[in-house]
Every structure is written in C-alpha cells, then in structure tokens.
C-alpha cells in the first residue's frame, strides 16, 4: 500500500475526526476506524465521483437535444389530444352532456393539470 501525504485545512481535519468519533460511538473498534482509514475512504469516494463526472463529460448524451425532442413530443401529444377531444365532443353519443362539451373538457383538464403542477411546484407568495 502506498503512503500519501497531503495537507488539508483544519476544518477538514475536524470533520474527519467527527466521523471517526461517530463510528467509534456506534461501536467500531479503534483498530477498525482511524483517521487514516476514514481519509482513505473519503479519497476513494472522491475519486469515484471525479471519474463519474469525467465519464459524463465524454458521454454522447446531449441534454439540450434531449429537451428539444421531449418538448416536441409533448407538443405533438397535446395537439393530437386537442383534436381527439374536439372530435369526441361532436359525437352523438355524448351530445347534450355538458361534461363532454369541448370548452368544459378543456377547463376540467386545465384545473387538474394546475392542481398537479401545484403539488410538484408550489407557488411562492413571496415572489
């Protein structure tokens, strides 16, 4: 095993010592948990994160292109569904039922979408 010497800030030393203390308080033996073992673990984790980020940069995935395709599909779906709702509202099977009038269906959909969006993206009164 190679020996590595690195200089870190006092804050980092403090945080590593807190991890060591917490592990020992949880019942780990002093031979199992040390400043060195925790530092090695954190260094390995940091290296994995760094390598994962580098792989992402080299990836052929293009977020902007993905967003464009996703938006295009959503708009096509919205347009298609609007046409289907229009056709359905003219059906003689639902004629006279206000629940299936086009304007009422659109309003109902908007209300349901609005409540779902509010659930995930609550409006802030402060803005």
Swiss-Prot record:
GO molecular function: DNA binding
Example of a GO cellular component annotation carried by this entry: cytoplasm
Location in the cell: Cytoplasm
InterPro entries reported in the protein's UniProt record: IHF-like_DNA-bd_dom_sf, TraM_DNA-bd, TRelaxosome_TraM
Alphabetized UniProt keyword annotations: Conjugation, Cytoplasm, DNA-binding, Plasmid, Transcription, Transcription regulation
Disulphide bonds in the chain: none
Family, similarity comment: Belongs to the relaxosome TraM family.
Assembly notes: Homotetramer. 2 homotetramers cooperatively bind to DNA although they do not contact each other; cooperativity is achieved by DNA kinking and unwinding. Part of the relaxosome, a complex composed of plasmid encoded TraI, TraM, TraY and host-encoded IHF which binds to the F plasmid origin of transfer (oriT) in a site- and sequence-specific manner. Interacts with TraD. Also interacts with TraY.
Protein name according to UniProt: Relaxosome protein TraM
Originating species: Escherichia coli
